[in-house]
Design a protein with these regions (language model features):
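Catalytic cores of DNA base-excision repair glycosylases
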Residues: 2-9, 13-202, 206-215, 219, ...
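Intrinsically disordered, low-complexity, charged terminal extensions of DNA damage-control enzymes
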Residues: 1-25, 191-349
């Protein structure tokens, strides 16, 4: 397919059939707010559009500009992010907002080289912001785009070899103007027509040029990578409750998983356990509440949940500890895993 023809077909289709999403302007003539694209791309990392939409709307209402976000308290940012998962993104979004506001005069970089220097921004996110927010002539490859191109050209490749070939093809097809529309158009074709398991070739604007259109073999592309089986981890979570039925949480100061968030004491499942010195408490009763199961990107977790009822007169809290009422959990930066644990514990009180 000639370079110009592919971009023309996709752009013309997109202008008539784009998905209505809260981070997209309703009018193609309207100037795109880079902050809106910046925020949406952080949220869309490893998360579906359907899941992101309500979180994006709520987040943007509270933090409508990058300056307001940079001035916010990290705890508040993490709290409104709670439930979306992959919490390191929220920490990195906040760090990047601080850098942009304090060091770059509040101006989001419009080039790949400067964007990729910011916390939490890798190759894909930098390219996506450049293309969508600033209409730069860069190649963007997400799962949808990779699937569309692999089927369009019937690429019998997988993994890095596939990505390299897709990049070569797109490099020859990226238009000098309206790359923002071209990129989003390819994404939308993949998301609405050329899906992983459902393919609607009748509706696809590229079907006349697609090498696997209307063929049963289309669903086999892109060729699958054999994934390693997830490892299983086990451990213990401790739910300490006082007479007011408030639950003890720790502020996690460890880097990595659940950084800067409120967590329950635990051991056995992480290298850096969320430890607590139980000797500072007088424990009246102990109950085994059962097992909690939770899936992470690289491992599955099966852990015991232990309820400890405390003697209020013997409680001396450290600075990183706080008692929280179950009905107030949403006011704090508490990951979904711990909401599940509390729900299990409350059944045993």
């Amino acid at each position: 397919m000639q370079s110009l023809k592919l971009s023309e077909i996709v752009i013309n289709w997109y202008k008539k059939n784009l998905r209505i999403l809260p981070w997209r302007p309703k009018d193609f003539d309207l100037k795109i707010d880079p902050y809106i694209v910046f925020l949406s791309e952080f949220m869309l990392q490893q998360t579906t559009v359907k899941t992101v939409v309500p979180y994006f709307i709520n987040f943007l209402k509270k933090y409508p500009t990058i300056e307001i976000l940079a001035k916010a308290k990290l705890d508040d940012v993490l709290a409104i992010w709670s439930g979306l998962g992959y919490y390191r993104r929220a920490n990195n979004l906040y760090k990047s907002a601080k850098i942009i506001t304090n060091e770059l005069n509040g101006v989001i970089p419009n080039n790949y080289e400067d964007l990729i220097k910011l916390p939490g921004i890798g190759d894909y996110t930098a390219a996506a912001i450049c293309a969508i927010a600033f209409d730069k002539k860069v190649v963007v490859i997400d799962g949808n785009i990779e699937r569309v191109i692999s089927r369009l050209f019937e690429l019998d490749l997988r993994g890095n070899d596939l990505k390299k070939k897709v990049r070569e093809i797109l490099f020859l097809n990226v238009p000098g103007k309206e790359n923002s529309l071209f990129t989003q158009g390819l994404m939308d074709i993949g998301a609405t027509i050329c899906k992983p398991k459902i393919i609607n070739c009748e509706r696809c604007p590229l079907s006349e040029n697609c090498r696997v259109a209307f063929k049963n073999s289309a669903i086999n592309y892109p060729l699958k990578i054999i994934k390693e089986k997830k490892i299983k981890r086990t451990g213990n979570f401790y739910c300490l409750i006082n007479s007011k039925k408030e639950i003890l949480f720790l502020r996690n100061t460890n880097l990595g998983l659940f950084e800067n968030m409120h967590v329950l004491p635990s051991d056995g499942w992480l290298k850096d356990n969320h430890n607590l010195d139980f000797n500072i408490f007088s424990i009246n009763e102990r109950f085994d509440c059962g097992v909690i199961k939770h899936s992470f990107t690289h491992f599955d977790l099966d852990s015991k949940v232990i309820l400890l009822k405390l003697d209020d007169n013997q409680i001396k809290l450290k600075d990183n500890c706080i008692f929280i009422k179950p009905e107030n959990l949403d006011m704090f930066s508490i990951p979904t895993l711990y909401h599940k644990i509390v729900k299990l514990v409350l059944k045993n009180i």
